Design a protein with these regions (language model features):
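Alpha-helical transmembrane segments and their helix-helix packing motifs
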Residues: 1-163
Length: 163
């Protein structure tokens, strides 16, 4: 049983916001890490970050090691089982955009293409490609594409031409 448009719109908004929050969290925390100079503070810092986004238990189960910046970036960006990760949220966003399209059948719609393109870009990303591109550039590129998706949602579903 499908829940309808309202449920899909609510989830599109939820996952758009969740992706942006995860990106912001990652950017802010990695920037503030540069001011730290002691391993005890750093370890405490990473634990608090993971607890605050609900990822501490998953991190411990997945990596079974001391805190590593690479592992944390991978968890928050690329883990498809962590509900606060960019990849998980993007997959959910894509699912709900597809459902909206099924319910509404809009005439001109690049939304499916745009969301699918971003989803595949992240699907074929790994930690090495993120590091090569730079975390800031990686995050900025995703934010730009999410803004385009958001604008397309407004254009397709909310923009009314008065005649």
């Amino acid at each position: 049983q499908e829940r309808g448009n309202a449920y899909c719109f609510m989830n599109v908004g939820k996952y758009l916001e969740r992706i942006l929050q995860s990106i912001d969290f990652l950017n802010v925390k990695v920037d503030s890490l540069k001011t730290m100079n002691n391993n005890l503070n750093e370890s405490y810092f990473w634990k608090n970050l993971l607890v605050s986004i609900g990822g501490y238990q998953l991190y411990i189960k997945t990596y079974k090691s001391i805190f590593s910046v690479d592992n944390i970036i991978e968890l928050i960006s690329l883990n498809e089982f962590f509900p606060r990760s960019i990849k998980f949220s993007l997959n959910k966003l894509y699912t709900h955009i597809m459902r909206l399209e099924k319910f509404n059948k809009p005439h001109e719609n690049n939304l499916n293409f745009m969301a699918g393109k971003l989803r595949n870009q992240l699907k074929y990303s790994n930690l090495a490609s993120i590091k090569k591109q730079g975390l800031k550039n990686f995050a900025y590129e995703i934010q730009l594409q999410l803004n385009d998706i958001s604008n397309e949602i407004n254009k397709v579903y909310f923009y009314q031409i008065s005649s």
